[in-house]
Amino acid sequence: MTTTLYTSDHEWLAIEGDVATVGITDYAQSQLGDVVFIELPKLGRALKKAEAAAVVESVKAASDVYAPVTGEVLETNDALAAEPALVNSDAQGKAWFFKIKIADKSELGGLMDEAAYKAHTA
């Protein structure tokens, strides 16, 4: 079963076992506008919670995407390098950024469920 959680920095995590798939929320992409470039983390990179992991650039701004948990990057979404605009059309689906092996599941405790995230962005 997949559990989806959200950060206050507008990232989502789809959690399956000890692996989280990470991307930015639809709210975040709507604030950014048309996405033109994405820099993804390197495979095998060790990330600490709240560390800048990726960069998303739009016609409006460049923003960091932060690691929502401590862990190792297992996979990146190479389709985003070729087609960064996927973030605008499917931010919470095909446009995931990276998968991370969760080092400490207790770090998930500070994240929001969908209802809390909707209240956060209202």
Swiss-Prot record:
Similarity comment text for this entry: Belongs to the GcvH family.
Membrane listed as a keyword: no
Tagged with keyword Metal-binding: no
SUPFAM superfamilies, sorted: Single hybrid motif
Cofactor(s) it depends on: (R)-lipoate
Native organism taxonomy: Bacteria, Pseudomonadati, Pseudomonadota, Alphaproteobacteria, Hyphomicrobiales
UniProt xrefs under HAMAP family: GcvH
Gene from which this protein is expressed: gcvH
Protein function: The glycine cleavage system catalyzes the degradation of glycine. The H protein shuttles the methylamine group of glycine from the P protein to the T protein.
GO cellular component: cytosol; glycine cleavage complex
Residues bearing PTM N6-lipoyllysine: K60
GO BP: glycine decarboxylation via glycine cleavage system
A Pfam entry, by short name: GCV_H
Domain Lipoyl-binding: 19-101
Complex formation: The glycine cleavage system is composed of four proteins: P, T, L and H.
Gene3D superfamilies named among the record's database cross-references: 2.40.50.100
Cofactor binding mode and count: Binds 1 lipoyl cofactor covalently.
Protein's UniProt name: Glycine cleavage system H protein
Naturally occurring in which organism (per UniProt): Bradyrhizobium diazoefficiens (strain JCM 10833 / BCRC 13528 / IAM 13628 / NBRC 14792 / USDA 110)
Keywords: Lipoyl
